[in-house]
Amino acid sequence: MSKLPTVLEGIVEGRRGHLPEIRERISHVDVSALPASTRSLYDGLRGRGRGEAAPAFIMECKSSSPSLGMIREHYEPGAIARIYSRYASGISVLCEPDKFGGDYDHLATVASSTHLPVLCKDFIVDEVQIHAARYFGADAILLMLSVLTDEEYASLAAVAERYSLDILTEVIYEEEVARAVALGAKIIGINHRNLHDLSIDLGRSARLSALLPADAVVVSESGIRDNATVRELAGHSNAFLVGSQLTSQPDIDRAARELVYGVNKVCGLTTPTAAQAARAAGALYGGLVFEDASPRNVSRETAAEIIAHEPDLTYVAVSRRTDGYADLIQEGIGVVQVHAPYQGSTDAEIALLDAVTDNVPENVQVWRAVSMTGDHDGAALARALVESDSVDALVLDAGDGGTGTSFDWSGIPDDVKDISFLAGGLTPDNLPAALAVGCNGLDLNSGVEYPGQAGRKDARALRRAFETIRRFATPKDPS
């Protein structure tokens, strides 16, 4: 057994002190009669990730942590679990009370609120904790090799097996990986957090996963803060365990969507059902076009109806006008996208964007569509607009947009990608290449419509597109 890090040692000793209370809490239970679990975390994770399939997620219910303190004051694990059930393959529930604000009541609430397997996230040192975990609804438990000897692990694993509980075996060091393999662990959790000082090393899962057999299920834990990190680590991880990054956000559903799919927009929405399909598929933003000449034009009244029926998208008001953007603002509009023709110079572009910014509420973002195929140098303009800090985001497109036409993506400057959406001719078939460009997000439109029916979104094409987005793993640098 590894020497216990100081932070972990304190938590474990505290948990040992809780054992009498746990025994008393389930003293009325005939543990030999507890039913076996029928929900398998292992089955939900195996065959996922590793660059071959979409990675899985174990999303965690927690209200506080040693590194962050209080994360979520109004903590409702049942409601959180119902959100997670849309995106995850399993749900983890903190049960340690002193540092994480956990309780077995939370475990029972989550187990009753989801169809997914539920992991009891605890610092387990005694079999009574496993009895309690199963009694309150757990389908899997966490066993930490930094806490347990091989003999203790084997004894606790035998208890878990009686209840058909899967085991997430957590490792931090190479020596623990070797022990996990020798002990026959099937699900290996690689914790990026240094339990001495609580620092994060995201390279740990790559190093340690290389030491595991090919059939091991690898779960990357701690420090998974965004979709870019997921894509970077997906080549050697089957799944990701994420908690604080989700429960710390005011809108957990949006945070989960962003973690799983990234930041993407579906433009040219014309009906409530299309907006609902876009959001259900994984979009964060929905584009509403306010242009009479566009086949995707919507009236203010239609826009209001769309927003009312699908309020969980952030809506982008798209227009070619050069003024009057305030007229487009209504409840649900969080962005205006300036699609006006090129203004003739960088100074004129900045002046236009400054005027639009002054014309809309402070909480409404301003995006600029930049043609990468016009007479002007689109790449130079994009760079200049980013340097001027006059926009919140760029939408890099071909021509006037909405034509289904692409452009040469190799011409996109690296220093604008983090603030840019890639648009123009994106279809479910070319999305892997588009994602490899490395822009902040994608802007889908005609490529997810029925052929020859501009403005009519194909819900199955949307779903296929976002399934492709979810599967994407960042290609490894050959160097």
State where each predicted segment sits.
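N-terminal active-site wall of soluble small-molecule enzyme domains
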Residues: 68-161, 165-168, 174-179, 205-208, ...
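Active-site mouth loops of central-metabolism enzymes
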Residues: 58-76, 117-124, 168-171, 219-220, ...
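An N-cap/entry alpha-helix motif that binds or orients negatively charged groups
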Residues: 2-74
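C-terminal helical cap(s) of enzyme catalytic domains, especially alpha/beta-barrels
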Residues: 202-212, 234, 246-267, 300-310, ...
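Glycine-rich phosphate-binding active-site loops on the catalytic face of alpha/beta enzymes
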Residues: 132-152, 189-199, 236-259, 283-296, ...
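Catalytic cores of alpha/beta
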Residues: 125-137, 174-183, 220-242, 270-281, ...
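Glycine-enriched alpha-helix->loop->beta-strand junction motifs that scaffold or abut catalytic
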Residues: 87-88, 113-116, 135-141, 161-165, ...
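Glycine/Thr-rich beta-alpha phosphate-binding loop at enzyme active sites
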Residues: 63-74, 80-101, 179-209, 290-294, ...
